[in-house]
Amino acid sequence: QVISSAGQDNAELHLFSDFNKFYESPVYSSLDIIIECASKDAVREFSKRIIESKKDLLVLSVGGFSDQKFLSELQDLSIFNNAKIWIPTGAIAGLDSIRSVRKYLDSLTITTTKHPKSFAGAPYFKNSKIKLDDISKETVLFEGSAITAIELFPANVNVAVSIALAGIGLENTRVKIIADPMISVNKHEILCKGSFGEIHVIVQNIPSPTNPKTSYLASLSAIECLRGLCNENFRIGT
């Protein structure tokens, strides 16, 4: 049952945008599951309090789990408090397959292509010679590890952290980020190879109407994850 929710035009938005106020409210005490859709910094700041209050937590800003020490501590807390942490598939496909073959992976890469405006505000541009407004053709912004990518593009590549956690870790997962002014979708291309064979997934998502940094599919994935939790007697997928 949905006890309460807030959107941009919702009168209750002030309650949900101030975590301390929300944490002390009667609404919070009545909840079983908290859904995070704020930022990776919010995940690191508030997750432990949520788990310690014995609430389950569904996380969309998976980049908050790029700190392995923090994630391990949170997992220990969840066991102690009998609380669960859920990471939906998000704006990609194939996450269950990557989990299935994680012990047999040799390489795991993801190439993310978005319109330049999707990268507005990314810390990467503080020290880069590349200016978003000057990008007139497909431009590679970054190539490196998932752990570096999420720090430079915290609002754009949560999916890279998701596949890294499902697969061979953040240091070993390679990420390429491309800005393309001619593209109208958020494109993610995943390639993993190993003794099992190869998995090649391409997803082209419509950007969220209210936040072009992410994909509409990410919201739909969270909703489906929640729906699945409400019907644990029948499950499709790994």
PLM feature spans:
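Short, hinge-like loop/turn segments at secondary-structure boundaries
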Residues: 7-12, 75-78, 103-106, 127
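Rossmann-fold NAD(P)-binding glycine/threonine-rich loop
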Residues: 41-48, 53, 62-84
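A short hydrophobic/small-residue beta-strand
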Residues: 56-58
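A generic structural signal for alpha->beta connector loops
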Residues: 10-13, 54, 82, 172
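Active-site-lining helix/loop region of Rossmann-like oxidoreductase modules
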Residues: 86, 91-238
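Structural motif
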Residues: 37-38, 60-61, 88
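N-terminal glycine-/serine-/threonine-rich beta1-alpha1-beta2 phosphate-ribose binding loop
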Residues: 1-49
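Short, acidic/turn-prone active-site loops that include or flank metal/cofactor-
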Residues: 20-21, 62-66, 91
